[in-house]
Amino acid sequence: MRSADQILSLINAYIDSLPYNRKPVSLYEPIRYVLSIGGKRIRPTLMLLGYNLFQDDPERILAPACGLETYHNYTLLHDDLMDHADLRRGQPTVHKRWNANTAILSGDSMLVLAYRYVAQCPVEKLPAVMQLFTETALEIGEGQQYDMDFEHRNDVTEEEYIEMIRLKTSVLLACALKMGALLADASPADADLLYKFGEQIGLAFQLQDDFLDVYGDSRLFGKSIGGDIVCNKKTYMLINAFNRADEAQRAELAHWIELKTFDPAEKVAAVTHLYNIIGIDKMAEEKIAHYFECSQKYLDAVSVAPERKAELMAYVARMMNRKY
């Protein structure tokens, strides 16, 4: 079996070797840029680790695994444009380095390339793989639309938020694990268990991302801390701050949400202080731990020897202990 670090090296080498030699250069250069500025490569790593539970040659599925990474980066490229984000992984976003039209068109091309790479799998697996990938892509779009809709609502519930992040984030991690299992000839039951495992891990991962947006280190995080607060994003933390706040705290939160002109650093500091007083930081940490613990029962039920699961378990544990 390969270690997660060995798998990551395979993925990075494969991505670096992708020949973006079509023209015009102005279309493909942003794609090369997006895929070269780092990233944790979580989705292709999970796909190869899922495959490696059942088979010992994960390099066979590098093309579809990197298709998922290309798709993921396509979504980030368009998300950054919609969010007016200046930085991604500590580097200028595509629409800042080039322009909005380039971000749209290069992103569209990344989506097409993602399908090309994912389709590079055994022909007998193609229908199941493409059905899984297409359904996942549709769900991610639905999640993004919910996220945008929430910007105009003040009554978003915790349940609605969890469903939104399941669609926007969790399903792609779940897809990666299930696709790896399908390509490794795993049983349908084991493939479905890995999907459910990925869903729970994805929920924990996104909640952790929300947490780090407030409490992370911007030097490690690769983008400005407090961006969700500045934009009044309906996160698990903001929703529950309103739910748990007393009358005075709720009024102060509402004051910062309603302000049209403000100093961003002052707003982030004030809202973070309220989170701390209300206990939202601890509440979020407990919710993250809950989903991580729930995930383990699905992985435990996968019918392979425990020693074959060790690397996947260790990798996911490292994901949950990240600081960025």
Regions found by a protein language model. Name each.
Residues 1-324:
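All-alpha prenyltransferase/terpene-synthase fold signal
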